Amino acid sequence: MGLKRFKPVTPGRRFMVISDFSDITKTEPEKSLLAPLKKTGGRNHHGRVTVRHRGGGHKRRYRIIDFKRYDKAGIPAKVLAIEYDPNRSARIALLLYADGEKRYILAPKGVNVGDTLMSGPDAEIRPGNALPLEKIPVGTLVHNVEFTPGKGGQIARAAGTYCQIMAKEGNYALLRMPSGELRKVHIKCYATVGVVGNEDHKNEVHGKAGRVRWLGRRPHVRGVAMNPVDHPHGGGEGRGKGHHPTSPWGLPTKGYKTRRGKRPSDKFIVRRRNEA
């Protein structure tokens, strides 16, 4: 995959940098692996906004991704295609298993059409294969990591992300997360070897506001541009906040820790990300 730059024939093209989609081998998704996706506009079941700046965007259909893979242990799968997924930054790979079933997985870096992938404790250590952490050597880069055995991958699923296995102690493996946090994860949890593909996603530049709207993101209005009724920063003469920066609900921002004090998972965190 590469990046595509444009001549500044219009203001919107001047700084635009997008993917050239050269890694995509199939343009139409697999119908049996699609599901309808209803837009929420950032609202919950009460109709209240729970995530601001969401709404609109191009219509999408959800691609059903296999984040588990352990139920296909020992069954080889051939990579049929690398596809675009509008619901995530990573590409997805269409697999055809030897038993005839087709499934989508996150497309790892270095996996191409025609490759054969495996999952299970006896799988080879190579990009795209899924194994329990106890079977993966220390130092290996992995993605799509489970937090709870059997739940499916939850960590390192975005384009270009990975975790690194730093050590193994008893029933736990010590993983360095994409954030830099060191965390213990049970060795029975599955992970996929390698790095998530489409690494250049972080270098893309939308170039114009309209392209961001196509993605379903609405304008982010500054608090100082609002009225006092709408935001703690609102009102006043000029652009001053008048006090320490806060969120729209009055909580301090810019460095204020919002993580709940005592959580059951605290005992698995060896080093916080801000201490890395």
UniProtKB/Swiss-Prot annotation:
Subunit structure comment from the entry: Part of the 50S ribosomal subunit. Forms a bridge to the 30S subunit in the 70S ribosome.
Family: Belongs to the universal ribosomal protein uL2 family.
Ranges of biased composition (kind: Basic and acidic residues): 230-240, 263-276
Highest taxon of source: Bacteria
Keywords associated with the record: Ribonucleoprotein, Ribosomal protein, RNA-binding, rRNA-binding
InterPro entries noted in UniProt: NA-bd_OB-fold, Rib_uL2_dom2, Ribosomal_uL2, Ribosomal_uL2_bac/org-type, Ribosomal_uL2_C, Ribosomal_uL2_CS, Ribosomal_uL2_dom3, Ribosomal_uL2_RNA-bd_dom
Protein name, UniProt field: Large ribosomal subunit protein uL2
NCBIfam families associated with the record: rplB_bact
GO molecular function: rRNA binding; structural constituent of ribosome; transferase activity
Function of the molecule: One of the primary rRNA binding proteins. Required for association of the 30S and 50S subunits to form the 70S ribosome, for tRNA binding and peptide bond formation. It has been suggested to have peptidyltransferase activity; this is somewhat controversial. Makes several contacts with the 16S rRNA in the 70S ribosome.
GO biological process: cytoplasmic translation
Encoding gene, per UniProt annotation: rplB
HAMAP family (UniProt xref): Ribosomal_uL2_B (MF_01320_B)
Pfam families, per the entry: Ribosomal_L2 (PF00181), Ribosomal_L2_C (PF03947)
